[in-house]
Amino acid sequence: MRIFIAFEGSFEPFDVSADETVEVVKLMIKDYFHIPLSEDKQGRRYLELMYAGAALKDSWSLADVGISFCSTLKCFVKEEDKPTLYVFNAVTQDTMPVMESISLLDKTVSDLRTLVTLRCGLPVSVYCLRTPRGLEMYDCNTLKDYQTDIGTTLRLDVWDGWKEFLMGCLLGQKLKVQRYLSKEGPVLKYQKRVALYIAAFCGYIELTEWALKQGARPHEAVGVHPYRAWCHEALHADVSKCPIHAAAEAGQLLILKAFVNYSVLCLECKNAAGQTPLTIVFKHKHKDCVLYLLSKMWSTVSFPKISVPMRIYIKIKQWILRAQSHSLHKSQFCGARVFGAKVGDTVMVDGFTKPKMTSKSWHKAGNSDSQSIVLKLPSLSKQTASSKPVNPLAISQPDTRKQALKFHPLVNASSFSELQKHQQQNQKKITATARKKEKLIKNTYLPQVPLPPVSRVGYSHPSFFYATPSADFLLKSSFSSFLEHSGKTPWENAIYCLAVAR
């Protein structure tokens, strides 16, 4: 059976059998045209046959795909680059290829982490990279220092107890994010900034609105975990990136609009390289974002008697915020307030402390899920088995000794009613005795206490009026409540106190 092969402008006939596979035909074409093919760690160069617009697989036979006498097949030489490295994400359980040139192996771990952040959307401060042997890779070293070769699979590990939280952020699940927030104050603030960063990168509107309401700001740097707050010299440069930069890199137009409406300072927020959001969207060729940011930057802010260009308005606002920050810092310095790490806080130092970036789950990290706790009531048979008295306050508290709660056994109903009547009679006697004592003191000492005469002298100075509108109401309400609970007016109480004092 004769078929024709079209290759690079030539049209050559080939005699083949209908039972031949596509792979055999490719070998015939390679030998006829002397095409050099190769395959190594960096990539491969191979042939591809197409018939009726579809690519043919090597295992297919010609008859199975309907190739008959005088059919024409197109042949192409294709080159495919293999990933330089692979990164296994412990959060998503996916393996991410890193398609860069071989020169990447001569660069530092810091450069690789910058590329990984642009691909996965995680801030550089929430994860670390490890070699296949589990050795943590530090930013200051090169990839060759860890014997990293082409095709090596590295592992991305996050903070212990953060897997579920970060997965909720990557999926935009607000309830899951709220469920796995930390109970430590500084860590909680850091998690909210991380959530806003990931939401901005992925374009989740609902999660973005929640993070903004929680106090996270789009022009505020994500920063580092509080455990690494003292490792300033070893920090990655991208820890100063803000959520507005993540939205600009990903081309999330709706998020950019929300951030600019929240604060116009986002327009002039710069990253570690000194790039504004407008520069970043230019670099990544996001046309819609470029047009929006340009229109905002060249707009004006109108006041009752003046209109100010947006750039000037941002400068004024930045100057005011710096002045407020300086004044606040000065007042706090005079008050001797101390910020930062305190005694007992966890501090991590590279190479010395036990690593806390091993991607442990929430429960394995020692956290307790309040939503999964189920309280069990003791059985009724055990409640009536003992006659020991039990403190009623202890019923609402968990029993750490795992003992069943025990109550008084039920008594006879007639004896219980008699006991209740006896208690009521005693209470009445006590109340009557107290009232007799009060009357005795009142009748005995009231005539002996002289009251000051009422002054009717007029003064020339104006009367004093209390400015609070509700002052009269507060005084009357306090007097009425005092009379209700004590049974005496404030005037009678004052006389009583003077009499007792004498």
UniProtKB/Swiss-Prot annotation:
Gene3D superfamilies (UniProt xref): Ankyrin repeat-containing domain, Phosphatidylinositol 3-kinase Catalytic Subunit, Chain A, domain 1
Name of the protein this chain belongs to: Protein ANKUB1
The organism's place on the tree of life at top rank: Eukaryota
Any one Pfam family match given in the protein's UniProt record, by short name: Ank_4
The organism of origin for this protein: Homo sapiens (Human)
